[in-house]
Structures are given as structure tokens and as C-alpha cells.
Curated annotation (Swiss-Prot):
Stretch list, region Disordered: 274-296, 385-439
An example Gene Ontology biological process: regulation of DNA-templated transcription
Full protein name: Transcription factor bHLH13
Gene name in the database record: BHLH13
Domain bHLH, residue spans: 429-478
Induction (record text): By UV treatment.
Amino acid sequence: MNIGRLVWNEDDKAIVASLLGKRALDYLLSNSVSNANLLMTLGSDENLQNKLSDLVERPNASNFSWNYAIFWQISRSKAGDLVLCWGDGYCREPKEGEKSEIVRILSMGREEETHQTMRKRVLQKLHDLFGGSEEENCALGLDRVTDTEMFLLSSMYFSFPRGEGGPGKCFASAKPVWLSDVVNSGSDYCVRSFLAKSAGIQTVVLVPTDLGVVELGSTSCLPESEDSILSIRSLFTSSLPPVRAVALPVTVAEKIDDNRTKIFGKDLHNSGFLQHHQHHQQQQQQPPQQQQHRQFREKLTVRKMDDRAPKRLDAYPNNGNRFMFSNPGTNNNTLLSPTWVQPENYTRPINVKEVPSTDEFKFLPLQQSSQRLLPPAQMQIDFSAASSRASENNSDGEGGGEWADAVGADESGNNRPRKRGRRPANGRAEALNHVEAERQRREKLNQRFYALRSVVPNISKMDKASLLGDAVSYINELHAKLKVMEAERERLGYSSNPPISLDSDINVQTSGEDVTVRINCPLESHPASRIFHAFEESKVEVINSNLEVSQDTVLHTFVVKSEELTKEKLISALSREQTNSVQSRTSSGR
């Protein structure tokens, strides 16, 4: 029974389909292989993260760099099928001028807060579908998910069997694929094509390698380049030649307790992947080449997961605005990616015979016998532009040939089993380095942008550059208003003109219920003196005037008489007088 159909209702499916596309939704609910069914990865590259970050962060000779880089790792499912699963990924946001016009139009027509809520909800549903816990959910630690980040975060949950999807078809044909103008083309190169178009990805390149498929994307429309394909292929080409698989059937001579430990719900004793040892005396009787071939088995032991979780020996720092994701088991030079476990009463060695097989691949040798096997690294999300790596602890102790001796007890005291899922690395207790400081600086900067967005009215766009431009315009507008108010204040209370005598004759007369107040003052001290001066210059005789006050408006009505007066002349005289008044105020304010 499909897990997705039990967890998701119709509303959830509609939201996921609106962001990922209908094909991606159907594929995730029916065809995608979960990590619980991937028991091994066929080889790995310890410098994988550095290679991906270089493709994104370091421009080439033409000053070009990709917007995202994904490595799809070759893995083998429980059924024995080859599957491409998430190996690692890295992305950056498009620079100024890299976004296409179509993406700008789409981003302007949507509500940012509503869209962010939908994205986080979809990532939460994907996380729940693949069995992650709440503390390992990277969507909870993000305040905002951009288009490119949404594409990369969603891609983590996809896996492609041979011939399925863009990476699966590239892996099956062993030929590179170069797709240009993805946004405007009607073809769907992959089940994630709708998501790629929504992120504005114009160019998608798929290059097969020895250990998987490299997927690169750019928001620019690029013509196909053979030199670029060759450089990418040479960068990811493994130094180990491809070899055929060797099956390892197990012969157990002793009875083991029925209470057998299981991994991902499957009995290790029935799955054919039991831990094996060679007896010391049998190794001495073998030829030297055979002994070297079996050295890696001496150190391959198992321990019970319920007793204690393996200690992390490798960690990667948090980064600021760049995303880097690692899949469990892809950062070590091992073939077996999941955490192996040991039955509680299992103490006797198991004899293993090695017979040839017709499988296409074989288990590649591990590191030298002097190195310990490292536990698989957890999926993590890094938030910075740096691609620094923490050093691995590969020190060896005397007599320690087992993984349990190498990793020791969990120092944090957390004894529960390690769960699958994508957990952000920002919860580690480690010394603050420059990468962590950069991440915190970016978080503070984002908070300042949110505060600025809340006080700036009439925001044209939601991006940071437009917000800064709108803020500058708003500040200039406020500065201009401030100058006008200062000039008005100088005119009213701090004018440099000499004070005019306000000797007024006030006469009050009472007639019944009516009270008549007459104020007689000099013309120069009256506010309407300039209007009377304009009438005099125009040789206009004022017959009567009336003053009325209505709320905040003063209406002064004049009845005038003139033989040569016209409407245009009177308006011109009053306007000229008003202009002279403003100029005198300005000069006095200086």
C-alpha cells in the first residue's frame, strides 16, 4: 500500500501539484524509491561537494557559473535494481540580469507570503512522506524559500530507476543530454520539468559518469558546448575502472537467536547482507593477494542500532545563502550506505564463500586496512557561500578493528536510533567560525529587510534591490516634505522680517441677541494686505468684502469695480503678488 495515499488528502495533493506539477506528484506517490529500499551505493567520491560547489561558485574563463549542480548517485535497491538517488547538491540565487522576463512576470503576479506558506507546507509533506522526524525537517529552519532553493529541496526526494526521468534516461543511454530554452519549450525532459520552469531554469545539462549522473542548470539560455561536457565528465570521472559484481552468499554454521535485529524492516539474515569475517588462521593460509582482497572484511563489523547511535566523525559547517545537501552514505569511501547493525547474541564468525556473478557491478575495495570505516553522514543543509569542509577523524587505535571501537559511545547521551530524513546542520554544538558568523550576519540582514519592508509604502517588487530603491525614493520624498515644513515654520514663527505693530481698535456692540464685533487694524498687519495691494496696482476699487469661515477653510469675498479691469488681468495681478510673497518668505528663511 502506498504511504503517500495514506498521508495526503486531496487538498494536500492539489497544493503539491500546483508547485511541483501533476507528473511529479504522481511519480512521487507511485514510482519514487525511498531511502529505506536503497541498501548500498556503488562507489563514492570524497571530493564530491567541492566539485559541485566549484561549478556553482567559481566562474570559468567566460565568467560563467551554473545556478545549481546535482549529483545523482548510483545505488542498488533491495530488489537488486540500479537506481539513481540523491547524492549531493549545491545552488545559488540568480545574479542581477540572469532571471528571464517570464519568471519576473510570474513572480509579480503572486502573493509572496501565501506562496512561501505553500512552499513550506509542500516541503513538510515531502519530509513526512519519506519518514523524517520534526527535528530533522530543514523547512522549519527557513524563513524564506526562493525559486532555486525550492527546486533543489524538492529534488532531494526524487529517485530514478534506469530509463526513468531525465537522469534515468541519461544513465541508460550513457550519453550526455543538453537542453536549451527549457522554459519556452513544450517538451518535458523530466518529471521535474514543471518545477524547473517555475524556477526559471533555461538550460539543463545531464552528463553520465562512472558513479552516477551530474545534472547542471542555469537561468541563462546556453548553446550546446562539447568542451563544457568534456570538462564536466573529466571532473567527475573516477580513477577506478568499472568492474563486474561479485555475489557473496552466506553460509551460517550455527544457530542464531530468533529475535533477530532488522534494518528498515527486513531481516539481515534473510536478506543476504550479513556481516562476515575470515578467521585469522584461514587468512594466514591464503596467498598475499587474496589476503589484501579480504582486508576490508576484517574491519567490516556491525553493531546493534538500538544500543547506541554511531558518533558523527565528519561534519560540514553551516553556510549563508548557498545550499549544499549530502545524502546518507555518499561522503565515505564505502559501498554500504545505510547503518549496519549486529544481533545481540552474535559472537561467532561466519564463513563466506565468494562465487562469480553476472551482475553488472561489483563491490569496490574500501580504504586501506589501517583506516577505520566511517559511519554514513546524515543529510544536511548548509547556508553559506563558502564550501569549507570539516576534517574527518581517521585516527586508529591499537587492536581496534571494529566499527564499534572506532565510533565509541554517543557523547550527547542520545541512545535512540538515528532516523532517516533531511536535518539541517545548524543545531550542532561547535565553535563559532567564519562560516557560522557569515550565516548569522545574513540572518540579521534578512531581518533588517523585513523591517524595512514593513515601513516602506508602495513597494513595486518583492526583491531586495527593488525594496532598496523604493526606500531611497521614500526617504527623498520625506526629505522634500521636511524642507517645506521647515520653510513654513520659519514663515510663521521665526521670520526675520521686523515685527509689525498690531495696534487694533476692537469695538463690540450688542443689539438684542446679536453681538457685533468690529476690528480696525492697519492694512500692513492684516493677512489680506497683499491682496489689497494687488487691487491698488490694478486700479481696482473694493466696494465690499465679506469673510466667512467653514471648518478649516476661510472664504474671503471681494466686490470690486473697475472700468478697464478684465478677469485675466485680475488673476494675473493676484498670482504675481502671491509669487512675490513666496519668494520673500524663501529669502527670509535663508
